[in-house]
A protein has these predicted regions:
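Hydrophobic alpha-helical segments, especially transmembrane helices
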Residues: 4-5, 24, 174
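Bacterial N-terminal signal peptides
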Residues: 10-20
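N-terminal secretory/targeting leader peptides
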Residues: 27-121, 136-353
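Bacterial N-terminal signal peptides that target proteins for export
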Residues: 1-10
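Core domains of carbohydrate- and sulfate-ester-processing enzymes
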Residues: 128-130
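Sec/Tat signal peptide C-region and signal peptidase I cleavage site
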Residues: 20-26
Length: 353
């Protein structure tokens, strides 16, 4: 009888422990989240979608105190703000901290890469899952593995003067960002003027530049189609720019179940974002048409000619990273292999040793 009572008490204790543990892990949680961008802006879309999906998936158990439009974190402050715990999560952009996280912008160096945004998202996610150095450079600043990999559209050109061919670009002054695109422009006789995207409008209006490089949605966001009526699709590079970063201490405090939930919601939000982006670009195209923007596409032959005279940016980047003790060649080789595996063929061979 005493033996049965002992067994009963042990089982009761186990069940009680399991009950308390499950309820503890399901305790409501409120996290601080920020974005340098307005809540309804293009560049905040990945973050906004994640919050909506998390609240649905968690049944309201995980909620957020939200800080939008740079009210708490400005673009150049993102890395430090997340790492130091000013916020628990924030819209993440590697491009604003290239000196601290130089590996995270690797894809910008692969000129004329696959413009399929889903492919680019998939490749970058796979590389972060298989190349430890990519996550380690964020962990160095106390940031957890990225939750979302959100691409923008391919870099194209909008111009105040007619442009259809490579010859039309020669001698033109072009607003360009990031800095590594300056030698690409110079390779065909263009004059690059380093400019952040918000400055494009004023510089075009004043005649400081003739045209600008950027993704179609960004060119539209800064309203260049109001003063520049010639669009040339060149598909120079399709980057996976947008992410969502979490403070590493916050991440470590999560239960295994909560971590799985955050990763699951991150992947789901990525899918929702890609679908949303497709629809957003349709609206951009319609607005371009309504505003009288003339659309042309650079020929494949012109792309090959341009690529042939460009510097080998992937190789240059790989060597620069290796000199810093970072796996530049591993990242370069892997990106090229995954691109080829996805069926993409570059107009020239990149990453030559």
């Amino acid at each position: 009888m005493e033996k049965r009572l002992e067994i009963y008490l042990v089982l009761l204790s186990v069940l009680l422990f399991a009950f308390l543990t499950s309820h503890a892990s399901a305790a409501p949680m409120t996290l601080r989240v920020a974005s340098p961008y307005h809540k309804d802006s293009l560049l905040a879309a990945t973050t906004k979608i994640f919050l909506e999906e998390m609240q649905k998936q968690s049944g309201g158990q995980i909620t957020f105190t939200e800080f939008w439009g740079g009210t708490l974190v400005k673009p150049l402050e993102v890395l430090d703000a997340v790492g130091k715990g000013v916020v628990d999560l924030c819209t993440g952009l590697w491009i604003y901290a290239p000196g601290k996280v130089p590996l995270g912008t690797f894809e910008y160096n692969f000129i004329f890469n696959d413009p399929n945004r889903r492919t680019q998202s998939k490749i970058k996610r796979e590389m972060y899952e298989t190349i430890p150095a990519l996550k380690e450079e964020l962990a160095k600043y106390n940031i957890a593995p990225p939750l979302i990999f959100g691409p923008l559209s391919a870099y194209d050109i909008i111009s105040r003067v007619p442009v259809k061919t490579l010859d039309d670009l020669k001698g033109k002054r072009i607003g360009a960002t990031p800095t590594q695109y300056a030698p690409i422009a110079k390779a065909i006789g263009m004059a690059p003027v380093l400019s952040p995207a918000p400055d494009f409008y004023e510089r075009l209006e004043r005649g400081v530049i003739d045209m600008a490089f950027c993704g179609k949605e960004v060119l539209h966001m800064v309203k260049l189609h109001e003063i520049a009526k010639h669009f040339l699709s060149v598909e120079l590079n399709t980057p996976t720019t947008m992410s969502l970063w979490m403070n590493l201490d916050t991440w470590k405090k999560l239960t295994p179940e909560q971590r799985d939930l955050f990763l699951k919601v991150g992947k789901r939000s990525e899918e929702v974002y890609l679908d949303w982006f497709d629809q957003h670009l349709k609206k951009v195209d319609e607005d371009f048409k309504n505003k009288g923007v003339m659309i042309n596409k650079l020929s494949e032959n012109d792309k090959k000619q341009w690529a042939a005279v460009m510097p080998d940016l992937p190789a240059e980047w790989a060597k620069e990273m290796e000199a810093k003790g970072l796996p530049g060649w591993k990242i370069t080789d892997t990106y090229l292999e995954l691109s080829e595996k996805a069926g993409w063929k570059f107009p020239r061979r990149w990453g030559q040793r």
